[in-house]
Amino acid sequence: MMADEGIHEPIIERNKRTKAEIRAKEAGTLAGLYVADLLIREWMPGARFTWTSAEGSRIDEGTCILAIEGCRHQILACERIILNILGRLSGIASNTFRWVSNFQIPLAATRKTAWGTLDKAAVGVGGGLTHRIHRADALMLKENDLASTAEEGDEGAVRVRKVLSDVQTESIGAFVTVEVRSLDEALAAAEAWAERMLEHEEGVRLNILLDNMGPELSRDAVLDIETRGLRQYVTLEASGNITFDDLESWRTSMVDVISTSALHRAAPPLDLTCIFEGV
């Protein structure tokens, strides 16, 4: 970010010191302070600053977030970068808070992020779940994984069952997720995993990701798995183009968690401004 502004080393004080404040122009949930704090410490030597609002706090229009004193050149060089960081991450946190406040089923981010872990951290600040931070956290078997792992000719429920039966315990991580797209695949996943847990006395739950199945079909999958006595071996996650306007239709879906990139990809930045003393 600093390189984008042509800045490649810490900015040395070279003119009169001045004071400025970063203020909110709208209400929201504040996030990204730790990132901006590091930027100021590393790139604005000699600057004195105080955070007047805390990470995760709900702020109102006009709230002062940061009071800073440094040379005018330092502040002018860094103000837009600081505003961009705080604006984007606070926007994600605010959007996530809006979703979470209107829904009872836990909501999770996806890995479709522009700023990677920073975006996921902002989702967490807003009250959402981060899901996996990176691939090594948990084993996730999506369509491409299933296609590349299964034997030639295997497809659908047969492919799901075979791949889950062959999963190596040491590669699992915190949990296992398998992506399914039909009732048959969901049931095959639950049955295969239950058989495996009973045979090997393993205690890892399978997370079945119901991809683009919609609320009604997802509910059918949950009920089918429950009816067959397999619910204790799995959790059920719904995902696929779920928007804020869709939430009402998911209230009775009975899934355990909903994941959507709309938490972070559809979040407008929180509107912030930097005001210099005397303005």
Where are these regions (language model features)?
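Short secondary-structure boundary segments
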Residues: N212, G240, A262
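A ubiquitous, low-specificity "background" feature that marks scattered single residues
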Residues: L217-S218, E277
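Hydrophobic pocket-lining residues within nucleotide cofactor-binding pockets
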Residues: I242, L263-H264, F276
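Acidic/glycine-rich phosphate/pyrophosphate-binding loops and surrounding catalytic core
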Residues: M1-N207, R219-D220, D224, Y233-A238, ...
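Extended hydrophobic secondary-structure segments
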Residues: L209-P215
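Active-site loop ensemble at the mouth of alpha/beta enzyme cores that anchors a bound cofactor
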Residues: T273-V279
